Swiss-Prot record:
This is Small ribosomal subunit protein bS18A. It comes from Cupriavidus pinatubonensis (strain JMP 134 / LMG 1197) (Cupriavidus necator (strain JMP 134)). Belongs to the bacterial ribosomal protein bS18 family. Binds as a heterodimer with protein bS6 to the central domain of the 16S rRNA, where it helps stabilize the platform of the 30S subunit. The gene is rpsR1. Pfam families: Ribosomal_S18. The keyword DNA-binding does not apply. One of its GO terms (biological process) is translation. It comes from the Bacteria. PROSITE patterns: RIBOSOMAL_S18. InterPro entries: Ribosomal_bS18 (IPR001648), Ribosomal_bS18_CS (IPR018275), Ribosomal_bS18_sf (IPR036870). Part of the 30S ribosomal subunit. Forms a tight heterodimer with protein bS6. GO terms for molecular function: small ribosomal subunit rRNA binding; structural constituent of ribosome. GO terms for cellular component: cytosolic small ribosomal subunit. Keywords: Ribonucleoprotein, Ribosomal protein, RNA-binding, rRNA-binding.
Length: 92
């Protein structure tokens, strides 16, 4: 049985052209060196809320568990203080 040796270059090209290929996720907060997520930073918090108003899970965003808990608390505080809407039905 003969084996075909594949180049890494061809493998990368195939992965980029494949529509099912997904890049490795990383934690934005770890890279940035954030210690505490602030509930007043609405631009960052909006990135982690889906179109329907739900908090996006860590398995989709790549956020570490430590930061996901902080993110969850920060979003809930911002909602409680009326800085962010609870649902997608409210307009800013």
């Amino acid at each position: 049985m003969a084996f075909i040796k594949r180049d890494n270059k061809n493998k990368k090209r195939f992965q980029q052209q494949n529509p099912l290929f997904k890049r490795k996720r990383f934690c934005r907060f770890t890279v940035a060196g954030v210690e505490q997520i602030d509930y007043k930073d609405l631009d960052t918090l909006k990135d982690f809320i889906g179109d329907n108003g739900k908090i996006t899970p860590a398995r989709l965003t790549g956020t570490k568990a430590h930061y996901q808990r902080q993110l969850d608390t920060a979003i809930k505080r911002a909602r409680f203080l009326a800085l962010m809407p609870y649902t997608d039905l409210h307009k800013n």
